[in-house]
């Protein structure tokens, strides 16, 4: 019975991009580039179907390295011997496993990439083998239950790996069981649950189990199991949860989590989910037998409850989702160059649950503390680095859910000082009276000792001259005497080197017209002036900053413009100033050797900024006290405050009533009035001044007003229907905003019309919308006076107006009399009867006519209902020349009453199947004469009593119907009529016959043409066809 779908054989390639990259090292001379292995592809875990026709598995491994890397593989921690001709082949760095088997090849694989720099180890890849066996061949026992009960059909899937998906068949493929509120297929066990059975569930059931693997899908069917239903049990019973989710469900961050919950019950229970210690995300599916969390996070951890509810009660089940996580890097190591003899500290850190442990590898081997190396969990420390410490290092973080690797190369260097990559600048311009910094940065390992000279004079630190620890020469208060050659000397134990530059002194840059501070209003324009003088041999540029941040003049739609009239003018213009444009502006004029700057303050007045610190206190049922702190007035006094509220999460902000009604600008607290009890609110504050209304504050913390008794009566009170002896009352459930408190429900009062005693019923739950009162003494269609109020744990609300509701109806008890039926055509009969009297069982809706052929059983009768209280009906769609038995029953909403005595009727013979033939016509000046051969019926056809003719001389006009008892007809026509379309058919007791159609044309004075039914005169086909259809419809709709 198993079926499998596969793709044609191909090479399975499993690869992943390396998680942590490494950069290549360049030597000091920029010649040969040498760097250790950096993974570009790493193997991924493989699920290989045991029955697969694939002949090989490829585990990918590729590393970038110089010189190129060589590769080795480990299986279950042991290095593999990859010999020519064996089942395990090395192709590049990839491992190819030929004809893989579970016994020999299932396990954990790692790739090792090496070159002279060092070795790195790939992540682990697990090769697993998937399978799905066949279902047992034994016949399955029938499942028995009463109709109306819930039932479970077990799947009992065969041995398999990994998990399966399930569907169920009813009787035959592909008649799958639908996913609806009454049926549920557990994807955990495969079992089929039916909450409440009915007659349509009878049949044979088969479980379909499907395995989805990396590149194949296989399905198997179970033997059919028969579901037998005994007599219907109409009793109502409370929900009982049968498909339950575990008490604890473990999940990894990012996985999909599915909780299953399904219950038996009558009526079919409704399923609702809630998070006991939090709220459900609106993106989750929460009203079905499964709660799905598409991508679980730590915020989703907690206790969840499933509630199954119907009118008879409820059942609940709870379970906890525990979220854990694979390791994830917070901090990784990176490629590092270090000087010989120096100290180095590397660190890496990872998050995960459980907390990951960290270990270190050097060239693929475990690294432990020894001599100059100290390993402390996530820290690796080196003292006095030597050349032997160079190599490839890996930080490994792992917990029970996975392992991650971070790789880096350590290059320990010993180099003599070398200025070829970074010499001292050849020409060093400097401004008179200014300061110059001349770096000295030779490449050297270990770090070189640096000395400076001017000409032949060694420089020592003074008030004007300083050599910093990193070798930079600083000269202050520069004068012409400082011009000359300056040489940096660098030396370490590997050697020495020097580099020389020439210092040239230039005139200083000065601001000649500084910008002035200004006050402006929002939307104004302002120009800040800035002029400068400079050394004429050098270029001058202006830059502007606002509060020390550079101004971007190229930003599209920006507010800043600058003047480019002269090199010495750098004015700034602010267009349509906004509040954010206020602050400290700095104009800087600069050359390559020095700069000068001046500042100005711009104050922009505008509407107030948002208030802060919105706090709610003194929470009542309809009032709260709100306080806030003043925001920025933006240089214009605050005139007033406005308070707004909303109901999260999606409510709109609305202005609220306050005390005082008008809140002045110096206030920092006010009372909010007119709130709804037991409602969640957020509040915000908006300030205004003479220049406008500012931005609102951030929302306050969410609060809930205190509870109060309901203040509004439920609406939509109605009812009716149900089983005998029942009174069903319906109402519209009250929304959250009208509940005013917890413990919400409804108090129903009802009494028979005319009685003085009220009965009451308490219906808990805000979502409740109906109540069923059952009492055998309640007569059918008895009027009850009904009223309703709501309640919560703070008290009862107001009562609604009284409504009149009727108890359940019963079927009519009296049958119609004097039923008479007569065939009126070959396919129709008329039926008439005497009406029944309206009784106390309910409202009579109409009559149901049942009719069946003589010789058939009444169980095979067809039925037709009248839409009102008419006492006659025409039944169509009958067979010709056939005797029918007919009964009539009255019906109401509860069903149909007893049948009348049967009447008989026989339909007429069918009309002749031949149309009139040999049609001829003659035009005169004012009339048209048409003749045809009479139609003689066969013995099994009804008599011909006359003929109908449809005549149309204008395609835009409605055809005219003419009747005749003869085989000819003469009709008046205008003299200018040149052609017409005519249809002629028989009529009689059996109805109208098949039409003959002819297109007649006036041929000069008098003409005659004989109609040939095989080859008739034909106008444009579309004209004839479209208008023939119209004429047929017209003839059929007329009753003669």
Curated annotation (Swiss-Prot):
It is linked to Epilepsy, early-onset, 5, with or without developmental delay: An autosomal recessive neurologic disorder characterized by a combination of various seizure types with onset in the first decade of life or during adolescence. Most patients have developmental delay, impaired intellectual development, and behavioral abnormalities. Belongs to the immunoglobulin superfamily. Contactin family. It comes from Homo sapiens. Disulfide bonds join 61-111, 155-207, 261-306, 348-395. A lipid is attached at residue 1012 (GPI-anchor amidated asparagine). Residues 43-128, 133-222, 239-322, 327-411, 417-504, 509-603 form the Ig-like C2-type domain. The lineage of its organism: Eukaryota, Metazoa, Chordata, Craniata, Vertebrata. This is Contactin-2. One of its GO terms (biological process) is fat cell differentiation. The keyword Zinc does not apply.
């Amino acid at each position: 019975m198993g079926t499998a779908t596969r793709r044609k054989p191909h090479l399975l390639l499993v690869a992943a991009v390396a998680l942590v990259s490494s950069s290549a090292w360049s030597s000091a001379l920029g010649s040969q580039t040498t760097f250790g292995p950096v993974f570009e592809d790493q193997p991924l875990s493989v699920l290989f179907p045991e029955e697969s026709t694939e002949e090989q598995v490829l585990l990918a491994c590729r590393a970038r390295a110089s010189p190129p890397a060589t590769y080795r593989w480990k299986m279950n921690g042991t290095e593999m011997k990859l010999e020519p001709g064996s089942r395990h082949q090395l192709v590049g760095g990839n491992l190819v496993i030929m004809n893989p088997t579970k016994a020999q090849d299932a396990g954990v694989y790692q790739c090792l990439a090496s070159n002279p720099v060092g070795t790195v180890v790939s992540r682990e890849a697990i090769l697993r083998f998937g399978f799905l066996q066949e279902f047992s061949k034994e016949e399955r026992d029938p499942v028995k239950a009463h109709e109306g009960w819930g039932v479970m059909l077990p799947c009992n899937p065969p041995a398999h790996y990994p998990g399966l998906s399930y569907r169920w068949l009813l009787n035959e493929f592909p008649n799958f069981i639908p996913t609806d509120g009454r049926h549920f297929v557990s994807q955990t066990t495969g079992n089929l649950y039916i909450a409440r059975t009915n007659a349509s569930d009878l049949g044979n059931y088969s479980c379909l189990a499907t395995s989805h693997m990396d590149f194949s899908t296989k399905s198997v069917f179970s033997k059919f199991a028969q579901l037998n239903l005994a007599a219907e049990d109409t009793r109502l019973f409370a929900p009982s949860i049968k498909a339950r989710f575990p008490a604890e469900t473990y999940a990894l961050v990012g996985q999909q989590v599915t909780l299953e919950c399904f219950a038996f019950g009558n009526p079919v229970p409704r399923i609702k989910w809630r998070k006991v210690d939090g709220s459900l995300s609106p993106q989750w599916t929460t009203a079905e037998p499964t709660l799905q969390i598409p991508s679980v996070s730590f915020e989703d951890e907690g206790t969840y409850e499933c509630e199954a509810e119907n009118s008879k009660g409820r059942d609940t089940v709870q379970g906890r989702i525990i979220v854990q996580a694979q390791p994830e890097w917070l901090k990784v190591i990176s490629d590092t160059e270090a000087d010989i003899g120096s100290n180095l500290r590397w660190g890496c850190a990872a998050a995960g649950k459980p907390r990951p442990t960290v270990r270190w590898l050097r060239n693929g081997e475990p690294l432990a503390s020894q001599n100059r190396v100290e390993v402390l969990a996530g820290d690796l420390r080196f003292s006095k680095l030597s050349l032997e410490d160079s190599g490839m290092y890996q930080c490994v973080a792992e917990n029970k859910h996975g392992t991650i690797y971070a790789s880096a190369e350590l290059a320990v260097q010993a180099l003599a000082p070398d200025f070829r990559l970074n010499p001292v600048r050849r020409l060093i311009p400097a401004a008179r009276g200014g300061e110059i910094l001349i770096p000295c940065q030779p490449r050297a390992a270990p770090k070189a000792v640096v000395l400076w000279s001017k000409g032949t004079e060694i420089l020592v630190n003074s008030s004007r001259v300083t050599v910093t620890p990193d070798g930079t020469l600083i000269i202050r208060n520069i004068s012409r005497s400082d011009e000359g050659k300056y040489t940096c000397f660098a030396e370490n134990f590997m050697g020495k080197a020097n580099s020389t530059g020439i210092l040239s002194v230039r005139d200083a840059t000065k601001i000649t017209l500084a910008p002035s501070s200004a006050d402006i209003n929002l939307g104004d324009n302002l120009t800040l002036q800035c002029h400068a003088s400079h050394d004429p041999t050098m270029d001058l540029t202006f830059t502007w900053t606002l509060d020390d941040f550079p101004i971007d003049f190229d930003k599209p739609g920006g507010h800043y413009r600058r003047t480019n009239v002269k090199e010495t003018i750098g004015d700034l213009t602010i267009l349509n100033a906004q509040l954010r444009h206020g602050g400290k502006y700095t104009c800087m004029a600069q050359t390559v050797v020095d700069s000068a700057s001046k500042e100005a303050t711009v104050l922009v007045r505008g509407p107030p900024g948002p208030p802060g610190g919105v706090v709610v206190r003194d929470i009542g049922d309809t009032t709260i006290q709100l306080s806030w702190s003043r925001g920025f007035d933006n240089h214009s006094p605050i005139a007033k405050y406005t308070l707004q509220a909303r109901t999260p999460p999606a409510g709109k902000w609305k202005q609220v009533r306050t005390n005082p009604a008008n809140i002045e600008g110096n206030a920092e607290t006010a009372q909010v009035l007119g709130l709804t009890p037991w409602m969640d609110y957020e509040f915000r504050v908006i300030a205004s001044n003479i220049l406008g209304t500012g931005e609102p504050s951030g929302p306050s913390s969410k609060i809930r007003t205190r509870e109060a008794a309901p203040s509004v009566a439920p609406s939509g009170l109605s009812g009716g229907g149900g089983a005998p002896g029942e009174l069903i009352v319906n109402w519209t459930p009250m929304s959250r905003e009208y509940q005013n408190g917890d413990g919400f429900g409804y108090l129903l009062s009802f009494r028979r019309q005319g009685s003085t005693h009220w009965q009451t019923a308490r219906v808990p739950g805000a979502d409740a919308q109906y109540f069923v009162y059952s009492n055998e003494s309640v007569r059918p269609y008895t009027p009850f006076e009904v009223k309703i109020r709501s309640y919560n744990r703070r008290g009862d609300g107001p009562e609604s107006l009284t409504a009149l509701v009727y108890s359940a109806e019963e079927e009519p008890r009296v049958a119609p009399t004097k039923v008479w039926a007569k065939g009126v055509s070959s396919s129709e009969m008329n039926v008439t009867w005497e009406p029944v009297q309206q009784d106390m069982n309910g409202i009579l809706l109409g009559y149901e006519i049942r009719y069946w052929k003589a010789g058939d059983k009444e169980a095979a009768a067809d039925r037709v209902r009248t839409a009102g209280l008419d006492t006659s009906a025409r039944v169509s769609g009958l067979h010709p020349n056939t005797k029918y038995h007919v009964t009539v029953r009255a019906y109401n909403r509860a069903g149909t009453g007893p049948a009348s005595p049967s009447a008989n009727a026989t339909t007429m013979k069918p009309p002749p199947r031949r149309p009139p033939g040999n049609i001829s016509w003659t035009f005169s000046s004012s009339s048209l004469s048409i003749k045809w051969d009479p139609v003689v019926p066969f013995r099994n056809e009804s008599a011909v009593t006359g003929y109908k003719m449809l005549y149309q001389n204008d395609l835009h006009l409605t055809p005219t119907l003419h009747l005749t008892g003869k085989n000819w007809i003469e009709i008046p026509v205008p003299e200018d009529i040149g052609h017409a379309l005519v249809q002629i058919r028989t009529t009689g007791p059996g109805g109208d016959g098949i039409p003959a159609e002819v297109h007649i044309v006036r041929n000069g004075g008098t003409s005659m043409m004989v109609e040939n039914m095989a080859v008739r005169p034909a106008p444009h086909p579309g004209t004839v066809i479209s208008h023939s259809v119209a004429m047929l419809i017209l003839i059929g709709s007329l009753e003669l």
